[in-house]
Amino acid sequence: MSSLIDLIFFSEKRKNLLVQLADGPMDIDEIKETLNIKACALMPQIKKLKDMDIIVQKGNIYELSDIGEVIVEKMLPLTSLLDVFDGNKDYWSKHDRAPIPKHLIKKMDMLGKCILEEPDLDHLFEFPKHLCDRLHSSKTVKSFYSYFCPDCPPIQAGCAKNGAEVHLILDEKVYNRLKNDFEGEYNVLLENKVSLYIYSGKIRPSSFMVADTFMMLKLFGKDGEFDHRKIMSFTPSALEWGNELAQYYIDRSMKIN
């Protein structure tokens, strides 16, 4: 078993080849182009996989064997999970993951390859400018905030004005501050039919947002400290994961309007 694991995971070339063949048979030229690899580097990896009967060759076409199909089917979720943590191990290990429900922890491979974004000091509480077009063209936006974000009311109202279905979940203290100290912004949200919710639970993320083409998640540190950095992903499966997270908190919140 260890030799099989070594064969698959100790070579990026072999692993990437198997991932590509999971989509169907490919000829050698397609493989070289897709993986951006020369034949002299590719053929030794193909031979090793053929020797283990993980892939089979039919003329110039390569495909997964029946055993290979089973192996790759089980391998893909693990590969996706490794993509989630690769490059962001420090963030995931030092932040409080308790706000992520267990059923979504088990499906974290759905997040795919994530980006860790750290805003500069002059724009700590501002919405990322490179996501504005994506946000404003979204038909559905679901957000959660445990802290008061000055950008939040106009952003949510703007999306609603554009015809989006907007759901905004707020910590109870944040909601009260918005309603009492920012009455104008609060009324704008109501006028534009933004669905408002109050979340009173003790365990909560710092914030998250899921729109049509992106999701982002911000967690508190394990000692409760605030961190401006956020995890972002753009894959369809990540959006599905983000919508499940949003629904989890909507189901546990009180709807205001």
Where are the regions a protein language model picked out?
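Primarily the HKD phosphodiesterase
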Residues: 131-186
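Basic, Lys/Arg-rich alpha-helical nucleic-acid-recognition elements, primarily the DNA-binding modules
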Residues: 1-84
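HKD-type phospholipase D/PLD-like phosphodiesterase module
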Residues: 172-206, 211
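Amphipathic alpha-helical dimerization/coiled-coil segments
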Residues: 79-130, 134-137
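Signature of lipid phosphatidyltransferase scaffolds
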Residues: 93-96, 222-257
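Short beta->alpha connector loops
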Residues: 24, 146-150, 202
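Short solvent-exposed loop/turn micro-motifs enriched in small/polar/acidic residues
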Residues: 48, 199-203, 225
